Structures are given as C-alpha cells and as structure tokens.
Amino acid sequence: MQRRPSENPPESRMNLLNLILFINISPLMLTYTPPESRAPVQAREHPWLLLLLVFAWLWPGVFSHDLWNPAEPQVYAAVENFIRGGNAWMPAVLGEPYFDVSPVYVWVAAFFQTALSPWAADVYSASRFATVLFTAIGLTGCGMAGYRFLGRHQGRSVVLILIGCAGLIMSGHFLGGMSVVFAALGMCLYGFSLVQTRVIMAALLLGAGWALLSLSPGWLLAAAFMLMALSLPLSRQWRIKRYYITLIGAFAVALPLMSVYPFALYHTDAAAFFVWWQYHLFGDFGGSASFQTAFSLPYYLKNLFWFAFPAWALALWTASRIKLHQERWGVLALSWLAVAFLLLAASSSRYQNNLLWLLPPLALLGAARLDGLRRGAAAFINWFGIMTFGLLAVFLWLGFFAMNYGWPAKLAERSAYFSPYYTPDISIMPMVVALSFTPVWLWAITRK
C-alpha cells in the first residue's frame, strides 16, 4: 500500500523547527527577567561625605581672623558685657541697650568663650562657635524636613542647596544673631514635616521655633508664621486631625516661652523694657509707639538673585514640573514664601540678610525635582558654580600672596592702600586647612 504524503508539509516542518528552537532556548528563558522586574542597581552612598562637606564649609571660616563684619565688634562687646556680669536679658554695648542681637545668641557665645578660650581658641573664634551651633541646627532641621517631606536623597539635596547659597555664608561664619533666625526657621520647617508621624515632637519644634523667632527679629515675624500655620488648613492637604493636635500643642509651648522674655526684662530693667516695647517689639517694623512700613520689594528682589542662587532657580524648575498646590510640602512652601515676601516688601529696613527668611522653602522646593533636572541646565549650574567659586579661590590666593609676599606687585600696592596698617602674619592652622582643601577641590571638579 502506497504511503500517503502529508497534506501540509511546510506547516509540519515549521512546527518541528519551533519545537527544536523551544527546546534549545527554554533553559535560557528560565534565567531571563523582564526589565521592569529587575531590581534597580543600588548606588553607592556615602553620607559621611555630606558631613565632611558641611564641616569644610562651616568650620574653618570661624577660626583665626579678626572681627571682619562691621556689626561683629558690637556683638562681641555685648558678649563681653554679659560675661562681666551684665543683664542676661538685655544685651548692652557701652552701657546702652543693644537690641540687634538675640539674648540667646549672647548666652551661647559667652558659654563657648568661657569654655574654650584661651586654651582651645582665641576669644573671637570661641565666640563664633555659637554661630556654628545655630547654623548646624538650621541645616539639620531643613535637611530632616526635606527627608520627611521628599525622601532621604532630597533631604541631603536641601542641605547642599543651602550651603551653595552665597547669602548663608555671612550669617554662618560671623558673629551675629541671624544664625539664631536660621536655626529657628529650620526647627519650624522640621516641625511641619513631622505632623503626620510624630505629633509631640512636631509641636515642640514649632513652639520652640516660634519662641526663638520672637527673641531674634521681633514678634511680628513670629506672629506672621503662627498665623500662617493657622491658615494652612484652608488647603485640603493640611486638613488632618494630627495637624490640628500639633497646632494646639505648638501654641501651648510657644505662648508661655514667648512671655518669658518680656516678663524677665520688665523685672530686671523696667526702663529697657519700655524701650523694647515702644521701639523694638516688632523688630525692623519698630514698636508699639513707632510702627513703620515702607515699600522695599525692589531692593529685596534685586538682592535675591545673588543671595539665594541656586535655590530660587531650582525652585522655579520644580514649580514648572509639578502642581505645588497638590502637595502638602508645596502648599507649605508657597504659604511660607508669600508671608515672607509680604513682610520684606513692607519692611522699612533694607537689610539683605533678611532674605534668609526665604532660604528654607526655596531649598525645599529646589530639592523636590533636582533629580529630574535636564542635563543642559544641570551642566550650566555646575559650570557656574565651578567658575564662580574657582575664580574666587584664585583671587583669595593671589590676595594672600600679595599681602604677605608682595606679589603680584600691582595687587600688593592696592592691598597696602586699603589696609595700610596690615602686618604680614601667617597662621599655621588656616594654612594647613587651605593647603589641604585646595587640591581636594581641584581633584573633585576634574574627576570624571
């Protein structure tokens, strides 16, 4: 009997080929993982590098230099007056009340000067440790707020953005009460970030931050931020039970603490109390008998460009990427900026360091979408930072050689004109720090 040929020989051969192919590939398929199922490669993280960077930015600047800032001699005189037995609640300079520095700063500066001078540091450097402490508190508070609101990486980015702002350099390295303001703002921001997880800690931080603000730039700034906190539930993002409990606790902490200073000042120096009440109760806005306002918005906007760069640029990038009113931290940052800008616009005092009020929310906004920054924009900011601070470093080294060794001659001539009484004096510790960090910085900006 003749064998009947297959009706579909091409299909049979194709099925056989598919079977052979399946048998050979199936072992490989067992090890295949779709791209969306693969675990992302964990980047190597070195948190200690951030601490080292903050140390390099913050610590060396307080050592081995005289009172450079024009306000530093008065602050130092207030600290000396307190050490010699002056009124703890009323800083004084040459026997006159001095309201431009917080009593809290005077207390802490006096403590460090007594504890560290002269065996560990000179009197100026020891007093500046108060600035180091309050600046560190502010950076920690802002960084932890970024971590709670946005995530761990963004918390570090908040700190990096802050220390990258030129406006923080003076308040973070010189004698003065602005570091207390920065610490208080950092505490407030951190308190807001904890309202959903740690109510008691959030209330303590907010209350203490408001009280510290009332002792620094006056009661008006503290009252403005307290009213801002009360208005946040107008947004549905903040209509949560835990936030209401936090507000009650924060006011229970803040109001008694804020009443301590006027009560103590009245009972220790009634005349100084009435001067404070009538002329300094609201800080730059005056007091109960001298409240005054002006239109200063153009001045502050002009100085904001250099004071808060790159924070404001990164904040604008974030605002263009997401709808801020749909995020809890976005509503907070926008409300904070609105209150601060309103106060700055109406302030009768044109003092550029008041722009410090804007740095925490701008840094928080800037860190939110920092990872999504386009390559071209990121490269520009990187180039701008390298060129700006690189040229500044070159100028400082040239100035050092000109003032101490007479080279370059033209620059040495100008240095002698502006500082005719300068005597060449090279301190070992600053030289060690400068010679250590300069090659490290050059290596960091040239590595691939």
What are the roles of these predicted feature ranges?
Residues 124, 167-181, 217-218:
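Short acidic/glycine- and proline-prone juxtamembrane loop motifs at membrane-interface regions
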Residues 43-50, 142-164, 182:
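Transmembrane-helix signature of polytopic, membrane-embedded enzymes
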Residues 147-153, 185-205, 210-213, 322-323, ...:
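Membrane-interface transmembrane helices that cradle and orient dolichyl/undecaprenyl
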Residues 75-81, 208-209, 215-329, 333-352, ...:
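Transmembrane-lumen/periplasm boundary regions of multi-pass, lipid-linked membrane glycan transferases
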Residues 125, 129-149, 187:
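Transmembrane-helix motifs of polytopic, lipid-linked glycan transferases
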Residues 17-59, 245-253:
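Start-transfer (signal-anchor) and selected internal transmembrane alpha helices
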Residues 57, 74-100, 104, 111-114:
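Extracytosolic helix-loop segments that constitute the early lumenal/periplasmic catalytic or substrate-binding loops
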Residues 42-72, 235-236, 252-266:
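Transmembrane signal-anchor helices characteristic of membrane glycosylation enzymes that use polyprenol
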